[in-house]
């Protein structure tokens, strides 16, 4: 995936930008992942609910802005995922080689289980939807209800596809704006767009 480095307008801050499908008209400034699973015939998506005053009960994927050090888009996603889970899935410790090992495990978890890639043009955001393997367990007690790095109050939840759509269609919309769009809706409500439920 090609990229360029730009300087943010009015500042000296450099930002890296990737391009979706090598198209310079489809810049990516941030990226994230939505994990899905099926249990007892019902489909679920893993989301974090932010409970800060300015974003009450807003549901989001796991992701964030591209760093200058990111060589590929999955570098961004795996780093943000690790930070937002407080490294509660694969533990990060101070030894550099262990940290890299944890990051590589997250990269592999994402890359080996991709279901769909979505480019959100309005938000300049790239979303990976990945099916979580049955042997991967999210320990919510270990992950906690507070993101340590950015000091954000949040909780982690598996919610059903139906609940996702209910939150999306609510007033106000409780899904993070970077996830708004028809491609996301088509994925979570395929039957309403002429697709089978397995698509």
Task: Place the predicted regions along the sequence by residue.
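Extracellular structured ligand-interaction cores
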Residues: 28-32, 63, 125-127, 153
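Universal eukaryotic N-terminal targeting presequences
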Residues: 1-2, 198
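The catalytic Nudix box helix
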Residues: 61-114
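Nudix hydrolase/Nudix homology domain
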Residues: 54-58, 112, 121-199
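Extracellular/periplasmic catalytic domains that process cell-envelope and extracellular macromolecules
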Residues: 26-27, 39-40, 119-122, 149
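Short, P/G- and charge-enriched loop/turn segments at secondary-structure junctions
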Residues: 15-24, 113-117, 143-146
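N-terminal strand-loop-strand
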Residues: 2-61, 74, 90-91
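Active-site donor-binding loop signature of nucleotide-sugar glycosyltransferases
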Residues: 50, 63-64, 161-163
């Amino acid at each position: 995936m090609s990229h360029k480095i730009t300087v943010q307008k009015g500042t000296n801050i450099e930002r890296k930008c990737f391009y979706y499908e090598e198209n310079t008209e489809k810049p990516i400034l941030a990226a994230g992942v939505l994990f899905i699973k099926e249990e007892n015939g019902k489909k679920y998506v893993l989301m974090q609910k932010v409970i800060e005053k300015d974003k009450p009960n807003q549901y989001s994927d796991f992701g964030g802005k591209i760093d200058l050090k990111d060589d590929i888009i999955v570098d961004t996603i795996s780093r943000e995922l690790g930070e937002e889970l407080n490294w509660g899935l694969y533990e990060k410790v101070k030894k550099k080689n262990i940290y890299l090992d944890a990051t590589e495990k997250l990269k592999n978890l994402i890359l080996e289980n991709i279901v769909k890639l979505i480019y959100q043009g309005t938000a300049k955001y790239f979303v990976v939807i990945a099916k979580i393997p049955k042997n991967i367990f999210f320990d919510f007690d270990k992950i906690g209800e507070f993101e340590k790095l950015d000091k954000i109050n949040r909780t982690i939840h598996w919610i059903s596809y139906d609940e996702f759509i209910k939150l999306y269609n609510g007033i106000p919309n409780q899904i993070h704006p970077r996830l708004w769009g028809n491609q996301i809706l088509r994925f979570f409500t395929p039957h309403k767009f002429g697709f089978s439920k397995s698509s």
